[in-house]
Amino acid sequence: MLDDRAKLLLKALIERYIADGQPVGSRTLSRSSGLDLSPATIRNVMADLEDIGLIASPHTSAGRIPTAKGYRLFVDTMLTVQRGELCSPELAPDQPQKVIANAAQLLSSLSQFVGVVMAPRRPSVFRHIEFLRLSERRLLVIIVSPDGDVQNRVIFTEVDHSQSQLAEAANFLNSHYSGLGMEEVRERLKTEVDQLRGEIASLMQAAVNVGSEAMAASQEEVVISGERNLLALSDFSNDMGNLRKAFDLFEQKTQILRLLDVSNRAEGVRIFIGGESQVVPFEELSVVSAPYEVDGQVVGTLGVIGPTRMPYDRMIQIVDITSKLVTNALSHRR
């Protein structure tokens, strides 16, 4: 257990390091901590903090910097989040893809780090389908989802269809299967094709296949904004190895998606410092995340990714308010 003096010095050291990014020495702490302690006494306390792994000494400096363990103690026991300090940004109701893209940009612009948003998970359900004859054996399939997204795909058929046949197929699909998932429609068509002419059944199977692929492709799993913000941070601009690792992480997206998936199962804001998530094993990065909802159901997660040297109190506010804005925009979209 740390005594009050050690806690105050650790808090002062971390806040100073977050502010200017420079290793903090005993003389600096003596002036800024508000404690009536000599630099020698502070050096002794800092040595104790280093022994238990809360701070570390870079080889090039006599000062100290926080470790991931130190940041974790700071976030869990010393951080005070002042609510209401942020201006009230807006996120207008819109199509889900637009809301998600705007949210990622909002997170990035407010934090000056990287904004990430996991797209809402939804089944490939269609509300309406139409066929338009383009030329012989060449059709345009128009698929409308329940939330108004429109997907257009061109398909080629084995036989030529008249526009009246295309209308017959579309009417059958819309009257029997509207509101169902594409996979369920595919399975039901297999058992109900007896009542349809062979060429019409074949057309509908092809349409369902291409529709399922189109709707799945339209659901971009994670949207990332602001990667270039890392270039302005000394934490990365002075270390090309770390910068390359970060950009590889954003390009592949798989680990970010897994991390957001973990956050999806938690309530409220979560903070992952350095490699402690074991999903993104990157000691120089921290993630602040929160789930968002649609009509009371958690459907995705969003967050900010930045250096471990981030102002956690402000990031918590940014992520918390953005999750509420996304929830409101998606739940009240007209």
Swiss-Prot record:
It comes from the Bacteria. The keyword S-adenosyl-L-methionine does not apply. Keywords: Repressor, Stress response, Transcription, Transcription regulation. One of its GO terms (molecular function) is DNA binding. GO terms for biological process: negative regulation of DNA-templated transcription. The keyword Membrane does not apply. SUPFAM superfamilies: GAF domain-like (SSF55781), Winged helix' DNA-binding domain (SSF46785). Pfam families: HrcA (PF01628), HrcA_DNA-bdg (PF03444). Gene3D superfamilies: 3.30.450.40, Heat-inducible transcription repressor hrca homolog, domain 3, Winged helix-like DNA-binding domain superfamily/Winged helix DNA-binding domain. Negative regulator of class I heat shock genes (grpE-dnaK-dnaJ and groELS operons). Prevents heat-shock induction of these operons. NCBIfam families: hrcA (TIGR00331). Belongs to the HrcA family. This is Heat-inducible transcription repressor HrcA. It comes from Paracidovorax citrulli (strain AAC00-1) (Acidovorax citrulli). The gene is hrcA.
